[in-house]
Amino acid sequence: MSGRFISTHSVALVLPMHIAYMPDRGGSVHADAASSRPGGGFTTLCAAAAMGVPAAAASPLGTGPNSFAVRQQLVEAGVEVLTPELVGDIGVVIQLIDEDGTMRSVVTAGVESEPSRAALERIELCEGDLVHVAASDM
């Protein structure tokens, strides 16, 4: 492949929590463990880079600590970040996963939901570039 894999798919911080059951309305349940990891477009970009494909993120990242950590991980994976920093931070996705694998998510929007047309238009596309747009961001 002579071009880059460019993804506009939003990147958010994912907090998966494994639980025994979904709580009733107004109830609560304890999670076995909680951890955090970047999700969304991060996964696709890092997979492309791991296969030797030049990869570039075109999803906004912010100035907050979650954005800082994700930006660092993207760079370590060999992914170029094409968009300017926005003031704020990326959103968070809380995933409740019960014992049979059923998942429910609670999503907060962050700077990843604010891509400006002007910032995207400043990205120079080259022959052979492939632009990935996720339907979930539309």
Regions found by a protein language model. Name each.
Residues 26, 41, 91-93, 110:
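Glycine-centered small-residue hotspots that permit tight backbone geometry or close packing
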Residues 1-60, 68-69, 128:
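Glycine-rich phosphate/adenosyl-contacting loop at the front of the ribokinase-like
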Residues 35-39, 88, 110, 114:
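Conserved phosphate-coordination/catalytic loops
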Residues 38, 51, 77, 88-90:
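Short, basic and Ser/Thr-rich N-terminal targeting/leader segments
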Residues 1-11, 60, 72-85, 97-138:
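Ribokinase/PfkB-type carbohydrate-kinase core domain
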Residues 46, 92-96, 104:
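Short beta-strand scaffold segments in enzyme catalytic cores
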